[in-house]
Amino acid sequence: MSKHSLIENLKKQIEPIVEGLNYELYHIEFVKEGKENYLRIYIDSENGVSLEGCEKVSRAVSELLDDIDPIQESYYLEVSSPGIDRVLYTDKHLEKYKGYNIVLNLYSSIDKKKKYEGELVDFNENEINIKVEENIVTIPREKISKTTLKGEL
């Protein structure tokens, strides 16, 4: 099974558990760091995410994973909040943070810049528009390697 298929399968099974505990399943990733594998589950809530909330979700998801055993190799399960400088993975995330400052990291330079920071104005399937100072800058989505919320306290 491909990593993408694994993640999609896990999402379908984990999402109802997370929602049943009054959290949103923000993102799932399965990564190898050094010799270790990690299944990372990011949860969110309008009221924030507490350590106790992460523990509840971790226990519930761990039970499911023990039952269905979807991953053949050993791994560590981590459950956390996406954090203040969260990566915006989906259109749903972009929609939620319209009007907020974001950082766009690019695969290749546009006007000699590989990083743009500004207010998320709008987006569609092909591009993201941000306001930089008083100008609207349009960045093709295919050029974007990572979109991050600019955390502000």
From Swiss-Prot:
Top-level lineage group: Bacteria
Lineage, highest ranks first: Bacteria, Bacillati, Bacillota, Clostridia, Eubacteriales
A Pfam family this chain is assigned to: DUF150_C
Gene expressing this chain: rimP
Family named by the database record: Belongs to the RimP family.
Organism: Clostridium botulinum (strain 657 / Type Ba4)
UniProt-annotated location(s): Cytoplasm
GO biological process: ribosomal small subunit assembly; translation
Name of the protein: Ribosome maturation factor RimP
Keyword Cytoplasm attached: yes
Transmembrane segments: none
Annotated InterPro entries: Ribosome_maturation_RimP, RimP_C, RimP_C_sf, RimP_N, RimP_N_sf
GO cellular component assignments: cytosol
Main location: cytoplasm
Coiled coil region boundaries: none
